[in-house]
């Protein structure tokens, strides 16, 4: 299971988050999106070497998060169960498994609409 999918299941849990700049944030998770952006409510934020600040809500950009410290009584075994069904491998499509290089339905570089002019070497000289 991906980390983000696990974090998405943590709604309504109270966590401590440490940011890359040293700020400590404590609050209740309202939601986490696929970019790990985390939305909290009832937040206490302590900027490094400053006094704590109380906030109603706070959104944290995912790439600023260093640690998420989970509460001890959290039932990890139930949260880590991957309940998303696996995607089945698609059947090989015609032309899809042609190996490396260019190539689609009509082949590599040729095909219709190849550009200006006719045959290589130009047309007749006048």
Curated annotation (Swiss-Prot):
It comes from Caenorhabditis elegans. Gene3D superfamilies: 2.30.30.100. Belongs to the snRNP core protein family. One of its GO terms (biological process) is spliceosomal snRNP assembly. InterPro entries: LSm4/Sm_D1/D3 (IPR027141), LSM_dom_sf (IPR010920), Sm (IPR047575), Sm_D1 (IPR034102), Sm_dom_euk/arc (IPR001163). Keywords: Cytoplasm, mRNA processing, mRNA splicing, Nucleus, Ribonucleoprotein, Spliceosome. SUPFAM superfamilies: Sm-like ribonucleoproteins. GO terms for cellular component: catalytic step 2 spliceosome; commitment complex; cytosol; P granule; pICln-Sm protein complex; precatalytic spliceosome; SMN-Sm protein complex; spliceosomal tri-snRNP complex. This is Probable small nuclear ribonucleoprotein Sm D1. It is found in: Nucleus; Cytoplasm, Cytosol. GO terms for molecular function: RNA binding. The keyword Nucleotide-binding does not apply. Residues 99-126 have a biased composition (Basic residues). Plays a role in pre-mRNA splicing as a core component of the spliceosomal U1, U2, U4 and U5 small nuclear ribonucleoproteins (snRNPs), the building blocks of the spliceosome.
């Amino acid at each position: 299971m991906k980390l983000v999918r696990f974090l998405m299941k943590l709604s309504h849990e109270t966590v401590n988050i440490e940011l890359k700049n040293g700020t400590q944030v404590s609050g209740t998770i309202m939601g986490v999106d696929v970019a790990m952006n985390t939305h909290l409510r009832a937040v206490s934020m302590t900027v490094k070497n400053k006094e704590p600040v109380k906030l109603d809500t706070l959104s944290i950009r995912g790439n600023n998060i260093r640690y998420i410290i989970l509460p001890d009584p959290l039932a990890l075994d139930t949260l880590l169960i991957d309940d998303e069904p696996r995607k089945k491998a698609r059947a090989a499509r015609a032309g899809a498994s042609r190996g490396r290089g260019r190539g689609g339905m009509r082949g590599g570089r040729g095909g219709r609409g190849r550009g200006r002019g006719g045959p290589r070497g130009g047309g007749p000289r006048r």
